[in-house]
Amino acid sequence: MQQFEWIHAAWLAVAIVLEIIANVFLKFSDGFRRKVYGILSLAAVLGAFSALSQAVKGIDLSVAYALWGGFGIAATIAAGWVLFGQRLNNKGWAGLILLVAGMVLIKLA
């Protein structure tokens, strides 16, 4: 395991935020019919992967990727609820709980 440094955690946080922004812009793009939002989404994805590449310099890839994906999904669910009124059904909540449990297990491994 690599030695933890806060700068790598900060890069991971930036990657997560950019992934959420990319997903929101993708929704606003309406299937790339609204080109500006589509381009902004692509730029945010590029930024997210760039930030993730910096994060994995100090965080194991398996941990960084699991946290990036898991937090990105959970926060995108929250953004969908707040911005678009989207709701999870019981199966969706179960999936989210399993996702969070998986992230915890990977971090503890």
Swiss-Prot record:
MF (Gene Ontology): amino-acid betaine transmembrane transporter activity; antiporter activity; choline transmembrane transporter activity; spermidine transmembrane transporter activity
UniProt-listed GO biological process terms: glycine betaine transport
SUPFAM superfamilies named in the record: Multidrug resistance efflux transporter EmrE
Keywords: Cell inner membrane, Cell membrane, Membrane, Transmembrane, Transmembrane helix, Transport
Chief localization: membrane
Compartmental location: Cell inner membrane
Spans traversing the lipid bilayer: 6-26, 36-56, 64-84, 88-108
Classification via InterPro entries: Small_drug/metabolite_transptr, Small_multidrug_res, Spermidine_export_MdtI
Cellular component GO terms held in the UniProt record: plasma membrane
Cell inner membrane is among the record's keywords: yes
Taxonomic superkingdom: Bacteria
Membrane topology: Multi-pass membrane protein
Function: Catalyzes the excretion of spermidine.
Family membership: Belongs to the drug/metabolite transporter (DMT) superfamily. Small multidrug resistance (SMR) (TC 2.A.7.1) family. MdtI subfamily.
Subunit structure: Forms a complex with MdtJ.
Name recorded for this polypeptide: Spermidine export protein MdtI
Taxonomic classification: Bacteria, Pseudomonadati, Pseudomonadota, Gammaproteobacteria, Enterobacterales
Gene name, Swiss-Prot/TrEMBL: mdtI
